[in-house]
């Protein structure tokens, strides 16, 4: 639990693996202890649960995956947002992420769209276990692959540069999420990223939009 807490605090993905459904190597049903272990792993803040022998050599690989997925989904709604504990050494990104967490508790947000070149902001958002889906937009395939493991994150790759985020880049990100069916035009979203190009890639933008209103605004001001 301490390792998971520390990883969450630093925005590091946590994979919990090995013998999570060991009985399902030979049985089609899990034990109560295994169900409890999976549920507690999710509640503790794991990013990913991994099966090994259950799917590599077990008699019930599909049932094992289905069982683990079902248990995880059942308990995900009970996860509480994780607040920042150390407020003495906050970065720009920490402050933005904490603000997003508080906004989500005040107003109904459907999705958080984060434009990220290195994935750091997406990792920090994922570590807070927020209710809205996090749509992470990047231009790099390597970062896209890395973000697939993050809790609650749906990564999307787009073409072009995101070093300096203008309204056109924001529009491109939102349209990519729309095309994938992750958000709709009636959704309320939070949009975050880095407006200016810094060597340290500081996250310094936080906007709230209704998708259709933002797209109409950009179109009228082209």
Question: For the regions a protein language model found, what residue spans apply to each?
Answer:
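C-terminal binding/interaction regions
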Residues: 180-192, 196, 203-216
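Nucleotide-binding motor/catalytic cores of P-loop/tubulin-like NTPases across gene-expression machines
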Residues: 121-123, 129-167
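Glycine-rich phosphate-binding active-site loops on the catalytic face of alpha/beta enzymes
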Residues: 38-61
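Active-site-adjacent loop and "lid" segments of alpha/beta metabolic enzymes
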Residues: 21-40, 84-98, 102, 138-141
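Hydrophobic faces of well-ordered beta-strands that scaffold small-molecule active sites
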Residues: 14-18, 42, 49-51, 134
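C-terminal helical cap(s) of enzyme catalytic domains, especially alpha/beta-barrels
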Residues: 55-77, 203-209
């Amino acid at each position: 639990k301490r390792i998971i807490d520390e990883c969450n605090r630093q925005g590091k993905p946590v994979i919990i693996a090995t013998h999570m459904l060991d009985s399902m190597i030979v049985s089609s049903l899990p034990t109560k202890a295994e169900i409890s272990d999976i549920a507690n792993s999710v509640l503790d803040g794991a990013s990913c649960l991994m099966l090994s022998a259950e799917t590599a050599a077990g008699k019930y690989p599909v049932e094992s995956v289905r069982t683990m997925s079902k248990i995880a989904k059942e308990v995900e709604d009970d996860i509480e947002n994780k607040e920042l504990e150390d407020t003495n050494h906050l970065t720009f990104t920490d402050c933005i992420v904490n603000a997003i967490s508080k906004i989500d508790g005040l107003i109904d947000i459907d999705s958080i769209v984060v434009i990220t070149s290195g994935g750091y902001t997406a990792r920090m958002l994922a570590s807070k276990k927020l209710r809205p889906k996090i749509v992470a937009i990047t231009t790099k395939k390597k970062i896209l692959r890395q973000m697939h493991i993050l809790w609650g994150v749906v990564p999307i790759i787009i073409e072009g540069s995101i070093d300096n985020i203008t309204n056109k880049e924001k529009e491109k990100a939102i349209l990519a999420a729309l095309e994938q069916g992750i958000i709709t035009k009636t959704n309320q979203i939070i949009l975050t990223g880095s407006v200016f190009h810094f060597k340290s890639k500081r996250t310094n933008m936080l906007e709230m939009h209704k998708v259709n209103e933002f797209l109409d605004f950009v179109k009228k001001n082209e």
